[in-house]
Amino acid sequence: MRHDGVTLGAAIVLAIALMAAAVRVQAARDRAYPSGGDEEATVYVTSPAAARRMSLAYSTLAADVYWIRSLQYYGGTKRRLESERPQLAPPPALAADPSAGYPLLYPLLDLTTSLDPLFNVAYRFGAIFLAEPYPGGPGRPDLAIALLEKGLRQRPDKWEYMLDIGFVHYWFTHDSRAAADSFEKASHVTGAPWWLQSLAATTLAQGGDRRSSRQMWVAIRQSAEIDWLKQEADRRLAQLLALDEIDRLQHVVDTVAERAGQRPTDWPSLIRVGVIPGVPLDPAGRPYEIASEGTVRLSRTSPLWPPPEEPQAVAARPPA
């Protein structure tokens, strides 16, 4: 009997070691031979229930494998699509199916979180990936919210997921009222930080005001449990700073155009008349551009491109 127990224990250890080795080998292979888009055209198992049955006691390890594939798929697809610029418009298929550019992303994330329903990083990262507009993501805030709500069904006390749902509503569906409602709901969870209440009030009162956007990203950064999310919040805050600078520079360009009777189309002409000291750089260190019609904008080569689409102000609530 003891012999059987030892044999079974050894078999389990061997199985875990082999699966871990397979993950390492696959990761090394992907680094050496980056995959193309066609290779990722199928998901290993399409049914979360089937995946759980196949993984048996190793569902958490299997979730790690699917999470790695999710990251590889998202990163590889994003690099491929962004390398196809300057065709910045989404493909026609996106008009009918907004996830056409990343068709496997949600299925992979759904499998990952079904195998490990407490996979916090997969919910929070995955929601950002899903909500990102094309070509940086599939532009599916509805699926981002669905993923976070799936996490909330497992952990109703996870105020961070409610915060993220509000964030998706604010930035991607441009529904400031729904965002404020999510922040308000999160603020009532035991252990939630005090600033959620003020964030809800600010969002409801100011709507699309850039200051409330900045406050929101500061809140996301404060709640981030991993460095990547903090870095993403820093990038978004830099984008907001760039929008402030673009407004200021646009005022300079418009003033010069009014005085000179024609719009400047480059920075040297503004430097010569002494209205700016040099070529203005965005927070990432790339020069801003002046379009032919005199509009100041971010360079498409900047890490801050594309600039965020700012939410609109909240409409007044109709009387009861």
Per-segment meaning from a language model:
Residues 25-111, 118-172, 177, 184-185:
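Short coil/linker segments at helix-helix boundaries
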Residues 177, 185, 197, 202-210, ...:
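Soluble catalytic domains of enzymes that build or remodel membrane lipids, polysaccharides, and related
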